[in-house]
Every structure is written in structure tokens, then in C-alpha cells.
Amino acid sequence: VFEADLLISNPKIITKYHYTSDFLAIKKDRTDDWCFIVKDGVIVEEKVGGLDCWQMVGISYWNEEDGHKLSDDIKMTYEQPGGKERYWEQVPLVFCKKHYKVEVRECQENDIIEIDTFRELKAIDKTYDV
């Protein structure tokens, strides 16, 4: 799963064959962004802001078994009161986390550029700067 606001600058982080369920993340001493707390390589908590954590970068891989579970669990979560206000990744990481063992896969700060604003897009692609 890839978020639409990402520019991949290191194509090696994208793998053709991938057999674990994991999120790409950047090891951080401190972040104000969405991040993971990880124990023994497995994500145990997702939150906004943290110390000694892994900053989420918006790319995840899902093995076949977890992909099927995720399809059912997303539907179930979204049908519950308040479910439509949830982010999809909260389903396997928060609301149904007992169903999953989601690992973290390290990437580097310069592997991905996240484009959050029109100003950031214009800085990367001058054709938008009109």
C-alpha cells in the first residue's frame, strides 16, 4: 500500500517479492509525525509524536494471509460507530492488532520525499510554479 503523496528517490526500497507484513519507517530520536513503537522488530504501538521511535513513511507490504484478514477487518471496523473516521492503518495496528504481527522495515530519510503542501510540490516540480 502506497500513500499518494510520496516521491520515491530510492527505487531499491520497492521489492518485487515480499513475504512479510510490514511498514517502512525511519529510525528517529524524536518526531512530531506519525510513528511506531517497536519491540523485537514488531510494531506494538502507533501514535503521533514520540521519542526513540520509527517514523511512518506511508508504504506498507502485506502477506497474502494478512491481506485477506485486512480486507475483512477494515470492513468490520468501518461498519462500527465512528469507524469511517479511522485511518485504514489503524485497523491492523490499533483496533484489530491481535490479528496481526506487523514488522518495521527500515528505510532512510533520503529514500522518500513526502509532499504535504502545494509549496512542497512546486519546489520539486517547477511546472507547477506558474
Language model: regions and residue ranges:
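Short beta-strand-to-loop acidic/aromatic patch adjacent to the donor-nucleotide binding site
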Residues: V1-L7
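Acidic side chains
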Residues: D5, D22, D32-D33, D116, ...
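Conserved alpha/beta core of the MobA/IspD/sugar-nucleotide pyrophosphorylase nucleotidyltransferase superfamily
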Residues: Q55-V130
